[in-house]
Amino acid sequence: MSASSAAARPGDAVTGAAVPTHRSAPGRPAPVVLFDLDDTLMAHREAVQLGIEQHMRIRAYDPVAGLDVPVLWHELEERHYHAYLAGELTFEGQRRARARDFALAHGESLDDPAAGAWFDEYFAHYRASWRVHADVARSFAALEAGLPGVRFGVITNGELDFQLAKLDRLGLTERFEHVVASGALGFAKPDPAIFLAAVERFAETGPLGPVAYVGDRLRTDAIGAAEAGLLGVWLNRVDATPDPAEAALARELGVLEATTLDEASALLVSRLG
């Protein structure tokens, strides 16, 4: 395993299928389909909600009038995790910041050590709730059937070891030829550089066919990929209404939209097959 990629090994813990070879139609390099991880393959948002609700029960926090707990925790995650991606906080620092702000909203003040311990307790509940989305295995099967020799990879914003632990826990590690994480590279989605780094990895290990990227964030994932020259697919699981300017840019770049991985796979087979 390199500093920012995980080599595929025979077998697959989710579907039992072997990792695909690079053979495709005669004279045609195999296509590459890259995925985001959180809320694309893994049901991250659901795990977060289950984790924070369990943590609140254990800490015996009283309800706060007008405070939506899952919404607050999601907003804190967005704010502080993006500060980490921007280099304003360390990985552990963004965790402590989320813990401090959430606890303070419930009347508890935490110093750094206490905030770290608070987050560790929450994280155990979050980790216990990790699950793959129900359409993941079907998507792999459909892509393999419709795109012979298709190669799979992951591009994710986060620390490599943490994201690899998720893939391993979910039984998905075997599926991917390369896993590219922003924490190992120093730049993050939507920077075109991270998408191009992934493409270079695949070019080094086999003939390179057309490359697509599937992710749940329109700007960060689909538009970012399209601006790097990939086919961007926005996995809009929650039927979100995009910002008009981003929607216009997505149309200009040829971004595809799907509400499930089943739909995304059908679109990719149609475009790349």
Per-range role (PLM):
Residues Q94-R98, R131, A193, T259:
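Generic recognition of short, well-ordered alpha-helical interface segments
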Residues V48-M56, W73-E77, R95, A99, ...:
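Hydrophobic alpha-helical core bundles mediating ligand binding, dimerization, or RNAP-core interactions
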Residues A60-V71, H106-F119, R175, P207-L208:
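Short, surface-exposed acidic
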Residues R79-E121:
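A metal-dependent, Asp-based hydrolase signature
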